[in-house]
Amino acid sequence: MNINATLFAQIIVFFGLVWFTMKFVWPPIAKALDERAAKIAEGLAAAERGKSDFEQAEKKVAELLAEGRNQVSEMVANAEKRAAKIVEEAKEQASSEAARIAAQAKADVEQELFRARESLRDQVAVLAVKGAESILRSEVDASKHAKLLDTLKQEL
């Protein structure tokens, strides 16, 4: 065969092969490449969404942690205030109780002192009566002297 005819036949076969490839082989390959590109794009978009969701979740967690810390610090401050208030109330109550006990003790002491004075007055009156009786045995008027001693007792 002639080189020109062979070259011409090869060109026809080449263009036939190009046409066949473009008509039947290339569309499924292009479709597969497009699908693969779409999947990759979807994956990248999902990764980007995941990243932004993760960042938002991190921000929310940080906000919740800060809020939790604030609440805990408020609770601690309130507990400290309550404890200080309870201690102060206990001090005031103890102080008032001590004052009440001291006043009661003072009243008891005064009452006991009054009783002791009355007892001493009675004893002094009895001793005075006995002394006067022994001195004035001859002239004893018990009722008259008792009245005098009662007035004396009242004056003491």
Curated annotation (Swiss-Prot):
Primary localization class, coarse: membrane
Transmembrane regions: 7-27
Protein's UniProt keywords contain Acyltransferase: no
Keywords, ordered alphabetically: ATP synthesis, Cell inner membrane, Cell membrane, CF(0), Hydrogen ion transport, Ion transport, Membrane, Transmembrane, Transmembrane helix, Transport
Superkingdom: Bacteria
Membrane topology, from the record: Single-pass membrane protein
Record's subcellular location: Cell inner membrane
Any one GO cellular component localisation term in the record: plasma membrane
Keyword Chaperone among record annotations: no
Listed GO MF terms: proton-transporting ATP synthase activity, rotational mechanism; proton-transporting ATPase activity, rotational mechanism
Assembly, per entry: F-type ATPases have 2 components, F(1) - the catalytic core - and F(0) - the membrane proton channel. F(1) has five subunits: alpha(3), beta(3), gamma(1), delta(1), epsilon(1). F(0) has three main subunits: a(1), b(2) and c(10-14). The alpha and beta chains form an alternating ring which encloses part of the gamma chain. F(1) is attached to F(0) by a central stalk formed by the gamma and epsilon chains, while a peripheral stalk is formed by the delta and b chains.
UniProt family annotation: Belongs to the ATPase B chain family.
Biological function: F(1)F(0) ATP synthase produces ATP from ADP in the presence of a proton or sodium gradient. F-type ATPases consist of two structural domains, F(1) containing the extramembraneous catalytic core and F(0) containing the membrane proton channel, linked together by a central stalk and a peripheral stalk. During catalysis, ATP synthesis in the catalytic domain of F(1) is coupled via a rotary mechanism of the central stalk subunits to proton translocation.
Protein name: ATP synthase subunit b
Organism listed in the record: Neisseria gonorrhoeae (strain ATCC 700825 / FA 1090)
Gene: atpF
